[in-house]
Amino acid sequence: MENLPFPLKLLSASSLNAPSSTPWVLDIFLTLVFALGFFFLLLPYLSYFRCDDPPSPSPGKRKCPVGRRRRPRGRMKNHSLRAGRECRRGLEETSDLLSQLQSLLGPHLDKGDFGQLSGPDPPGEVGERAPDGASQSSHEPMEDAAPILSPLASPDPQAKHPQDLASTPSPGPMTTSVSSLSASQPPEPSLPLEHPSPEPPALFPHPPHTPDPLACSLPPPKGFTAPPLRDSTLITPSHCDSVAFPLGTVPQSLSPHEDLVASVPAISGLGGSNSHVSASSRWQETARTSCAFNSSVQQDHLSRHPPETCQMEAGSLFLLSSDGQNVVGIQVTETAKVNIWEEKENVGSFTNRMTPEKHLNSLRNLAKSLDAEQDTTNPKPFWNMGENSKQLPGPQKLSDPRLWQESFWKNYSQLFWGLPSLHSESLVANAWVTDRSYTLQSPPFLFNEMSNVCPIQRETTMSPLLFQAQPLSHLGPECQPFISSTPQFRPTPMAQAEAQAHLQSSFPVLSPAFPSLIQNTGVACPASQNKVQALSLPETQHPEWPLLRRQLEGRLALPSRVQKSQDVFSVSTPNLPQESLTSILPENFPVSPELRRQLEQHIKKWIIQHWGNLGRIQESLDLMQLRDESPGTSQAKGKPSPWQSSMSTGEGSKEAQKVKFQLERDPCPHLGQILGETPQNLSRDMKSFPRKVLGVTSEELERNLRKPLRSDSGSDLLRCTERTHIENILKAHMGRNLGQTNEGLIPVCVRRSWLAVNQALPVSNTHVKTSNLAAPKSGKACVNTAQVLSFLEPCTQQGLGAHIVRFWAKHRWGLPLRVLKPIQCFKLEKVSSLSLTQLAGPSSATCESGAGSEVEVDMFLRKPPMASLRKQVLTKASDHMPESLLASSPAWKQFQRAPRGIPSWNDHEPLKPPPAGQEGRWPSKPLTYSLTGSIQQSRSLGAQSSKAGETREAVPQCRVPLETCMLANLQATSEDVHGFEAPGTSKSSLHPRVSVSQDPRKLCLMEEVVNEFEPGMATKSETQPQVCAAVVLLPDGQASVVPHASENLVSQVPQGHLQSMPTGNMRASQELHDLMAARRSKLVHEEPRNPNCQGSCKSQRPMFPPIHKSEKSRKPNLEKHEERLEGLRTPQLTPVRKTEDTHQDEGVQLLPSKKQPPSVSPFGENIKQIFQWIFSKKKSKPAPVTAESQKTVKNRSRVYSSSAEAQGLMTAVGQMLDEKMSLCHARHASKVNQHKQKFQAPVCGFPCNHRHLFYSEHGRILSYAASSQQATLKSQGCPNRDRQIRNQQPLKSVRCNNEQWGLRHPQILHPKKAVSPVSPPQHWPKTSGASSHHHHCPRHCLLWEGI
């Protein structure tokens, strides 16, 4: 008895020493007295509440306490409402209590017995506490009961919200719940269940979720009041919700009514289980007392009190009615049943403090005593211990479940905080409470959940994991939930020790499978004490856990398959704990052993799958690393190869296959670096590879690599087996081949993959070659190149890859650039139309070269296939148009063969100093675009058009951008050459040159843009005769305009110059400078001057006064004039009419021939003779051009090889010039004012701004016409070239004559003043015919007269 807790000792002594009848009667009467006292105590509160209640009609009850009137009315009203509700509840409970007492006492109780029952008290410890309860007068118990029963109606803050009562701390230690108990206390279950006190649902806001038979096993009435207990917390609002009876703590010596008396501490102590303070103390005290309580105490107690006493006491229920005795029997029987079941469940929890055999013996003795007690009692209405003990494998088979369910759901539906069920360990904890308290708070009890705390004595150093994670999620003292279908589950001490040993290692295992477990896991006992550690699975905060549990149970249909997977798991992951059965699941997991084993096997399988995912992630990382280092390098350094690293994670076969295909198809630009470190001599390696040693293994390995994994089908066992097999194979294979790989040998599988790549070499190489011009849209070419050239050095492959990337980027941006170029051109402010015409007209070389250079450029620029067709149509149009335009021209027929004597320039050699007669002429030939309205203009184009044909043949792929750049460079060079005039001298010597040198980019852009508009120009050009004029720079630096075919745009530029100027501009400039300096030194009247645009116009005007008014020919087309003026905007010569150009050729080209050396070009001398003859003829009178003169010129052109033919040519040219100049002056008189107002610029002054007045369309038409004429005149180039050398000697005489003519005209021999045929020299005298007009150049006059 020394180890028996104080309450139990008190109860045992009181129950054994007191008479059987007196305690019952006394307790019943005391209870009645307390109920009445509680009622009277509530009367003042009722009157106060009715006073505050407006609907109350009673005026007598409106008298409220004076002290309470000072409180705010709103506060008093709220308080009154709450107190009224509580008072009504108390009254209802009191009435129910009285009715229950009356039914229990029946006729055995009268008023005379009331006073007698309040006197006697048992001696001993109980007697010491008697003054607190039974020894007091009838009035005192009423007063003392007030704090016990009245709080229901008291204004205490705890009553403010009934649902918060569960969270309030208990008034005092739970040991006080049994302090006033005596032997005279009646058993609690003596009250009938037929008359329960309806507990207000407000106090218990959480209804039960699931009916539990155990919850229905002991449903005591809530309104039941014990004997007067001042310190008891029996019926206080914070404890009345936890009324329960102890299960498994009743000593065998106690009779049924004494067992119920012993349950009073449970009734009083459970009230604060929701309270954190009371629950904490109760938790700690339970741990202390549970360790001290053992079976020896029970055995000693049984030895001192034989069962006969119990039987006698059981048969002494004479005061109870039959219903009361039935209730007592039912409750005692269920208590014993629950004790037996609890002992079975807790047998593993008491292993350290008491052996299961000793505890089972005590329970067995208790069952036997109860059975004997039942046999001796008369009524056995509901229970038979012998039968029920055999039929109770678990709490689900309790006797008469209908009665318990009915009583529970009807009267106590909200008894236990709304939790699913009342767990027995909560009652056990309250029954084992001692007066010792702990400072460390324990979590509240949980019901119908697994327990993670063993009912052993705890220290203040309890693991805080229980209390820090989730206070409401941890379990109470250990007991198994009632969900097991096999009650034979008993965790062995070995399993518990294993659970304790592997608890820490189970956390990482459970982390992927059960993420909710870690949050709710608590270590109940420190590991240093070798206590059982378990996991908690709270249902209250994780309601999905039952569903998960059912799902896990349902997925265990294949235990054999899971067993195999477990075996595989033990092989593939040997680092896991071998004894991980209890580490995966807690020892208290509510399943049978068989189901537990299957569940753990399933969890292991799930973990294996999860680790497989982690392995895949690791393999993907290895693959990423594989791209940065080759297999040979990683193996040579002693590191595990990427395949080995991928095999180690369990997915080797699949990832190795990926690696293999990645090596074959990986578009990574660094693939060349990976392959660059492999052996270079593949043939030698393949021959020297030891196939006999590695052949079988490698082939098997390759088959395994190509074999699809069956893990996708869900066969985990096969997947694991295959993975292990492949891993072993690969490890052996890689270990065997490691040295060979380092020596430069290649495994069979790698060799085969390389062979496949080598077989694809021709295709890949072809693709790369064809994509050089096609500009691939993706990087496949780079990849194929790297694979094909994998044997190259890494640096070489990098350079090649960089080149291919640049090439690919260049072609990718080709089309956008082609679109941006025209946009930039049109956005330029008043872009030069002449540059457009110059660049627009495709050179004869471009037209003739066909698909040679143009197709190549088209592919480079990604032109559509129609580009070639467009070029073909353009070439055909060019072939046919000149014939229709020039067929009716007698002059053209006459001068078709005239250029035979003109020497041709070197077609393929670099720039060389041309003959003296041609030195100053060729730079101006790109300025030869012109549209004229007369076919007669072609008569002066014979020589130059023939020479254009020769140049076209010599330069088949010459492009206009080169011409433009060359012209710009020449202009910059001409500034240093005093006698040299740049291509822009058609209007002024300075302004056109500046335009070219400042914006050569525009010219290049315009050329490329015009090429895009060539088809649109074809139709417009076919209906217009096209004759161009060229500025001929004579040896002394003077410039003249010579009409010629528009094809001379490119043809008149020397091939050598075109080839050398883009790269050797300075060389050409120096040569030109030397030539011009030599020519100027040989001229007598020559003086170096700066070119002036106004000088040429003034110097030329005196020569044409008679012609200015002589003739009125047809009005030129406005479009033609605009195109002529358009030419002034670029370095090239503006389009002019044939008369004006011819006149300039006559008047300007003859001037510098005075002191030409014999080496001067015969063509230049011939031109000088022509102009000399014309001007000599003009002195007398300008003669109109007649048909006879044209025929004469035509006949003389046939014998052009002689000087007489040259003289005839000069005569014809002079007649043509006279006619055109007269037309120019006649039209100019009536239109000059209109021109001035329209353009707001001088017609002939510097700078001439006509170049800003025209549009690009005219230039495109002009360019197309020029290209057409070039194509036609191609055939005439070769014979003219042959005749050039033969005609050089006869032309020398003409040169001499020109020199003599120049002596007669000293005023026009100044080279600097006659530089520009557009702007006359300023020192020229003005004629009377031009006095009324602006100073202008004859060419501009011709251009403006038709507007």
UniProtKB/Swiss-Prot annotation:
Name of the protein in its database record: Spermatogenesis-associated protein 31A5
Pro residues bias spans: 198-211
Lineage: superkingdom: Eukaryota
GO terms for cellular component: membrane
Keyword Transmembrane helix among UniProt keywords: yes
Parts of the chain that traverse the membrane: 23-43
Similarity comment: Belongs to the SPATA31 family.
Protein species of origin: Homo sapiens
Keywords: Differentiation, Membrane, Spermatogenesis, Transmembrane, Transmembrane helix
Function comment: May play a role in spermatogenesis.
